[in-house]
């Protein structure tokens, strides 16, 4: 199953709608951005989401609250993560791999893919992370845009992520929307997909777009399972 991360949440109502629609991860941005949230609001959102999960015992998925940071001192990342009860932290800046050793929560490390970069180059860039944090590390691949640390709405060549997705848990971000998320899943087979601007209307999260995006992911997963079964039917 492809995990869905709804990033850039700034309102509790949108977080709850995402969870209700079947999101696996929600992202809260603690870096300079139009989607920046303060720690009090973030804590409120996380508490509401986890409270909803407790009330809805039928919900099978684990909801993972992710805090997104950019070049923030490790001590501050750990403080915010503890205060807001985050499950993971996403490092979307220029943090060196050794920095990960100082982070107390499981990590998602963003790596920006440059134009014309080859798949072997991407693999080489990700390999040191496994040595620093082991198999618990998740990688997020996003499009490299000069002066930007994500949320640009620009896509990269998904074919270069194929090899990485076979070896590591990889989330693909950048330019995703309801219309193209099925294609990236078919091409790269990632652990997860990340969306922010692709589910917004006039810069604000749109609940109908959130639902449509998640539905598109689940539909693609179902189609791929069906195709796999038809090629290799279970016998006996």
Give each language-model segment a name.
Residues 1-236:
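Conserved N-terminal beta1-alpha1 strand-loop-helix module at the mouth
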